[in-house]
Structures are given as C-alpha cells and as structure tokens.
Amino acid sequence: MRALRALPALLAAAALALCGCYSFSQTVLPSHLKTVSIAPAKNLTYQAAMGDKLTQGLPEMFRKEAPSLRQVNSQGQAEFEITLKSYTNTPHSYNSSGTVDEYSVAIVVDVEFRDNVKEETIYKGTGLRGSGIYSMSKGESEELHGQTRALEEIQQLIVNNALSGW
C-alpha cells in the first residue's frame, strides 16, 4: 500500500529530472536539411534599423541551438522570412511622485520558416511578441536598453519555436 502512495511522487521526480535533458541535435533535425538562409526582416515600423538588428542576432542563436545547420546568404534548403509588424515604447510603471520609472519596449513579428526541399512550411508564427523593460531609476535612460532586451527575447522565441517544430 505504501508503495502505491509513493508511485506518484516517484513519477513526478523522474519527470522533473528529465526536463532539462532535451536539446536540439543533428539527430533531431530532418536529414535532408543542411543549410538555412535568413532573409533580411521586412520592417513595417518607424524604427529604421530595427529590422537589421532583428535579423543580425538570429545567426548566432542558430549556431548555438542547431550547430549542424549551416547558414548561407541565399537559397538555403530551409528559409526564414520575418516581418517586423510593430514597435512600441510605452510607460510601464510610475514612481511615487507620478513620473515614469520604467518603460517597456515591445516588438511584434510574423515569422515563416520553410523547407525548400519538400516545399512546405515548417513553422509559421504570427504576432510573436518580445519585450524589454528599462528603468530610469537604475540609470537606464536610453530606449536602447529596452530594445536590446526585447530583441534578445524575440530572437530566442523565434529560434525556439522554429526548432521545436522539427
């Protein structure tokens, strides 16, 4: 009887132990995909350089998460297209005197990751959101602090979502 009571706890412990074991590896990726190209992001916002910043951070994240997938400038066996849909910088919190203490930068994108060999979509995401908060009270007076955090968050989300589709 005691053994039956302990079974759920043992199963839960085993599940928790295995949570950190999954990673993307060459055996997880489809064998027919060896190269990926990342097109420059289409930028529909008033932030002229934001599309370039978004695109530039993705190759390094891919190298970390999917090292067997080689990146090429064009005509990859897999292809990424990203559209930067919106960019906002809004007050996030106020201090006791009523002035803004923190701002939140938010970036919203649409993503399509295609398999050009099989001519099918691997992953499509619409309205993916990354945000970054920067604090005036911590001396972060420039929007760039929030942009950097928002870009890192959205880039990681894009890569994780695309690779989890495999």
Predicted regions, residues:
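Surface-exposed short loop/turn segments
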Residues: 65-69, 75, 79-122, 130-147
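Bacterial N-terminal signal peptides
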Residues: 8-20
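Compositionally biased, intrinsically disordered linkers/stalks adjacent to structured regions
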Residues: 143-166
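A structural "domain/chain start" motif
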Residues: 19-68, 75, 117, 160-166
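Mobile beta-alpha loop/short-helix "lid" or hinge segments that flank ligand
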Residues: 26-31, 124-134
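Positively charged n-region of N-terminal signal peptides that target proteins for export
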Residues: 1-5
